[in-house]
Structures are given as structure tokens and as C-alpha cells.
């Protein structure tokens, strides 16, 4: 309600937190939540939890389909998935997202747990399945651009930042 916050957007990093809210919310709260999603004031990630690369793709796909069905009567759906600190995803995970209408996958690889694919971070690519369907992926690092832009206070410059900044 304050003009200086008009462009603020809350992002639910995982579907689990949305599911827990939904369990205790009134019908009015659910409708308000869905309206905020539709208006772009709340973002919902298709990612259920930030587990690891061994998530069961069938279970994930069924859970995601359930949520797309729940949001459909409100005139909205989940288009984007965001994952943090998970350094790999299966082709089945990709297919579950594609099959359930997810178009964009934003991933933040945690370099303390492993390294970026082909040692390249902060780049985009299309992840294509055998039938030619594609998912647009942003391959970022933990804190996304926060380290490179210096948004993390008192953070020592590391070799990855120097490399990214061309120093």
C-alpha cells in the first residue's frame, strides 16, 4: 500500500512453503494468494524443495501437476522453477517440468558443493529432451549475481569474482 514498495515481489522459493500455507489458509486467503500470484506480486517456483539431484522425477511430476490443477481455477499457473544450492538435475526432473508447463528454470549452483557445468556460470541455455521440447535454463551461482555485484557485505573477493569481472 506504500508507493515506494509498489514493485516489490515476494518469491516463494519452493512449493513446499506454499503447500504448508495452503493447508492452514482460509478460502479467502487462498483466493488472495492466487490473485497476488496472477498479478505478479508473488512468485511461485515449481521446485518442491532444494533436495539434491536424486529427486524422484515421477513424484515431483505428480506434485507439480497437482499444483497446476489447484491454481488453474484462479486463472494462473506456475511457469518458472528456481533451485538453490543443488548442483545437478536429472533429465527426468527436466521432463517433469516441461510436461507440467514450466518454461524457465533458474538454478543457482553452489560452488562449495561442486562446480559449474563445464566451468561456466552465469549463462543461459536450452535444455532439450529427446522429443525436441526445450526448457530455458539460467545457470547461475549461489546468490546469483550478488557476489559479482558486491551485494554481499564484507565478502572477500575470490578468484571466481575476479575472473567474472575480468581482473
Regions found by a protein language model. Name each.
Residues 1-167:
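Catalytic-domain carbohydrate-binding cleft regions of carbohydrate-active enzymes
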